From Swiss-Prot:
Gene it is expressed from: Whr1
Region entry Winged helix domain 2, spans: 120-179
Function: DNA-binding protein which is required for efficient transcription-coupled nucleotide excision repair (TC-NER). Acts as part of a TC-NER complex which assembles and interacts with RNA polymerase II (RNAPII) when it stalls at DNA lesions. TC-NER complex subunit UVSSA binds to the GTF2H1/p62 subunit of the TFIIH transcription factor complex, tethering TFIIH to the TC-NER complex. WHR1/STK19 then interacts with the XPD helicase subunit of TFIIH which guides TFIIH to DNA downstream of the stalled RNAPII, ensuring DNA repair. Directly interacts with RNAPII and also binds to downstream DNA.
Homology family: Belongs to the STK19 family.
UniProt region (Winged helix domain 1), positions on chain: 32-104
Protein name: Winged helix repair factor 1
Cellular component GO terms, alphabetical: nuclear speck; nucleus; transcription elongation factor complex
Assembly notes: Monomer in solution. Homodimer; when bound to DNA. Component of a transcription-coupled nucleotide excision repair (TC-NER) complex composed of STK19, ERCC6, ERCC8, DDA1, DDB1, ELOF1 and UVSSA which assembles and interacts with the multiprotein RNA polymerase II complex when it stalls at DNA lesions.
Keywords linked to the UniProt accession: DNA damage, DNA repair, DNA-binding, Nucleus, Repeat, RNA-binding
Biological source species: Mus musculus (Mouse)
Residue ranges of the motif Bipartite nuclear localization signal: 4-21
GO terms of molecular function: ATP binding; double-stranded DNA binding; double-stranded RNA binding; kinase activity; protein homodimerization activity; RNA polymerase II complex binding; transcription factor TFIIH holo complex binding
Winged helix domain 3, as annotated region: 180-254
Length: 254
């Protein structure tokens, strides 16, 4: 993202920066986020817990963090630090190689234990949360690592896969996963396309941010318009154009 685009994205969500005086209207999505942690805290508040019966940990996306922390290098370094400190877990969501979900570790632990309570996999899951989760912040795990370093037997690994804690990456390798996250991913992909379609169908393929957020969300947008707009800006699927009447979202030239 070039400098101009980064600055416009930060303005769209109220990240503090110096600006020339002028009658620029405040944007409806304001935040005080100045760090990756603050951005995640803001974003998880937008996550519709009730939609998933509070069975999932609140999930933010790396792309959304970029909408609030304009310098991607800084954002990535801060996310890596939070990951190394064990405060967050980063999850490969699967619909895109760059689609990374972010959850607070304690939220992840709580929801996973709840999802596996009373099931045959509970023992393997508890062992994983106690031994692997605190020691390794990686997105994926290898066969030798699981069996030799952490002492898991093949049947236990199978139980972790069945529980949704791991998903197969390739032979002898697994991604860390969130049990039941498939429902979220389905909602997210449909919602992203629906919000993009709203901008695409607008005159000149551009739409005022305030107007977009003021509209009634289509049925496909179950995660909320604000949740998706953060993603669209951070993923560079729309450009932010400041005007005297507020930020304009515009589809990039192709």
């Amino acid at each position: 993202m070039n400098r101009k685009r980064r600055l416009l994205a930060s303005e769209a969500f109220g990240v503090k920066r110096r600006r020339a005086p002028g009658p620029v209207r405040a944007d409806p999505l304001r935040t005080r986020a100045g760090s990756a942690r603050e951005a995640i805290e803001e974003l998880v508040k937008l996550f519709p817990r009730g939609l998933f019966e509070d069975a999932l940990p609140p999930i933010a996306l790396r792309s959304q963090v970029y909408s609030l922390v304009p310098d991607r290098t800084v954002a990535d370094l801060q996310l890596k630090e939070l990951q190394e400190l064990g405060e967050i877990r980063i999850i490969q969501l699967g619909f895109d190689l760059d689609a990374h979900g972010i959850v607070f570790t304690e939220d992840y632990r709580t929801r996973v234990l709840k999802a596996c309570d009373g099931r045959p996999c509970a023992g393997a899951v508890q062992k994983f949360l106690a031994s692997v989760l605190p020691a390794c912040g990686d997105l994926s795990f290898q066969q030798d690592q699981m069996t030799q370093t952490y002492g898991f037997r093949d049947p236990e690994i199978t139980q972790l896969v069945n529980a949704g804690v791991l998903t197969v990456r390739d032979a002898g390798s697994w991604w860390l996963a969130v049990p039941g996250a498939g429902r979220f991913i389905k909602c997210f992909v449909k919602g992203r396309q629906a919000v993009l379609s709203m901008v695409r169908k607008a005159k000149y393929r551009e739409l005022a941010l305030s107007e977009l957020l003021g509209r009634r969300a289509p049925l496909a947008v179950r995660l909320g318009l604000a949740y998706h707009v953060h993603d669209l800006i951070g993923a560079q699927l729309v450009d932010c154009v400041p005007t005297t009447s507020g930020t304009l979202l515009r589809l990039p030239d192709t």
